[in-house]
Amino acid sequence: MNPESALSAADKAEEEKKPKPFIIAHISDIHAGSQYFVPNLMDRAVIELNELKPNVVIVTGDLTDQGFKQEYLLAKSYLDKIDCENLLVVPGNHDARNVGYVHFEEMFGSRQSILHRNGLSIVGVDSSEPDLDYGTVGRHRYKWVKEQFTQKADFRVFILHHHLLPVPGTGRERNMVYDAGDILEVLQQCQVNMILSGHKHVPYAWRLENIFAVNAGTVCTLRLRGKVRPCYNVIEIGEDECTIWRKYPFHDADLIIKFCPSTVAFEKSPATESPTQG
């Protein structure tokens, strides 16, 4: 064996020893049934997710456009094609229209989500209100959220549909939950590392104290603000490092942000998209 081959084999063996990152695919705002829904974008996203083989797929709401049963059935038909044993889904404001939350519960179960796996804790809540666009977590849920995060974990994730922080280009009103400040304080006390949300179709990332808030765009509709494109997030959680990518169906990915959970040092990509930047 020549030295180069030996070195390559040694490097390969060393690489195989390293623990693989825990991968989360984060999609949002499918809006099945909308006139702006693009089936081939959702088809492609499903194919890409199955090729990615994530450990968890998270869907942060607005599966439907008006909360109708046929829209839920359409959304579910796509989500059922995703080959991942851990699928966490929370409803959005569109899903709560026309008493749509009853169909959500019939097809997806509880409107709250919990997963404790591989040192990771993920807790999701329903922030929607029936027939209203604004959202709230609600004081009655704070104790429950705290209880779910008491389990020992290396990395904690909170998921909901609405924003807890403003996102550029999303305008006023309805983008943040009414009790954003209170729930942020709860999450800070729980030592949550990351918040995942959707709602206004603008992908973005913020750091607030020790928490990183990451918003997803719409994965498969043309309800787009400015120059934003359909996309979803891919999150890689490794040894004291978290890297978040924005993936465009049929196209490449852009780095959004990379951070160290223990020091909260971070590097934000210039490619972070806003409605005024293409």
Language-model-detected regions and their locations in the chain:
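Short acidic, glycine-rich surface-loop motifs adjacent to enzyme active sites
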Residues: 152-169
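Active-site neighborhood of phospho(di)ester-bond hydrolases with catalytic His/Asp-centered motifs
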Residues: 26-28, 56-62, 87-93, 126, ...
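Active-site environment of divalent metal-dependent phosphoester hydrolases
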Residues: 32-36, 65-70, 74, 93-101, ...
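Conserved beta-sheet core of the metallophosphoesterase superfamily
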Residues: 172-243
